[in-house]
Amino acid sequence: MHEELLTLCDCAFEARLIELETRVSFQEQALTEISEALAETRLIGARNAELMRHLLEELGKVRNTLYEHPIDEPPPHY
């Protein structure tokens, strides 16, 4: 009877260990996916920042061109 109880405890511990190992495995997979998504998001953010910098630079050039060579400058309003 004592051996049967020990075997039942061993089975319960083994089942619990398997459950915990399974959870850890899923968490590791989720962590890998989150890490990959974060890396991709950082790349997209860096590309967007570079694009924004470029667009602001181009906008500045357009503004300078418009102020240097006004086309049909409107008359002053008093």
From Swiss-Prot:
Sequence similarity: Belongs to the SlyX family.
Protein name from the UniProt record: Protein SlyX homolog
TM segment ranges: none
NCBIfam families, per database record: PRK00846.1
Gene: slyX
Superkingdom per UniProt: Bacteria
Pfam families on file: SlyX
Gene3D superfamilies in the record: 1.20.5.300
